[in-house]
Amino acid sequence: MTNSENFIGAMSSMYNTLAANRAYLDSLNVFPVPDSDTGTNLCRTVKGGADAVRRMEQLGVTDLLEKSAKAMLRSARGNSGVIISALFKGFSDHMSRLGAFTPSELSAAFDSALKSACRVIGRPIFKGTVLSIVIACRNELSKSKFSTTKEAFSILAPAAEEALRQTRFDLEETRNAGVVDSGAAGLTLMIGAVDSFLSRKGEPKSLQKGEQILFKKHAPLPASEYTYCTEFIVLRKNKMSEEELEKRLSGVGGSVIVVGDGEIIKVHLHTNDPGKAMELSSPFGALTDIKIDNMALQAEQNRR
């Protein structure tokens, strides 16, 4: 298979693996709020990236990366989905600057992904979250010897799993519930899916009962202080920065994530006043793809 075919296949494998584990990832979701939608949101996010590059074998890997990253920004859903899209954007930006997808640059690409996510998260938490998986992957690659992407992901998969185990103890929410972080679990599954695909290990991995030392169903936790998970896309009409928009929105909610490219800005936040959040964002451009979920209602449904 060509490098481009491998990339397209790896994207599909990531989506298939998430889809196979969607319900279980949903059940792990306790941070930042227990709204049980991490698996669902990651599936929608990654499906956008996989669909965008399907049957695009004529493109080079860096072009495919850029295309999938842009699509994932548009399809991103939820806190975890928007963060994953920011990680992909940072990864893609690094490889695009090089002009080629180079295995020796994978550690630096993970570092670029980490920086991209940190720029768009108002208050990044490095321990016990998806970011801890990125850090572990970056660090492991920086001290390992490999010459191919296949070899790199055979190193990354166990490193991510080891880092995932630790997330059970790093956050109060996951400690109390006895689970690993759902977003971190999602990224770990994605990395494992790429490893399985490149190594031709067979079908995407599903979480089985024997693995519940890592993944244990929890009792739902108290709901967030904010009622609404609010998301929308801003169609840029000027050069106002994402940083300025993030600053405005941080006054009306929490879990604020603002990430953009040259055409759009994707906004995610938890708030009690979605209308105010949209009002503050409207000077940056027209709003589209508006989505508002009542997290208090979701949390109550999870208690039943």
Go through each PLM region and give its residues.
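N-terminal loops that bind phosphate or other acidic moieties
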Residues: 1-304
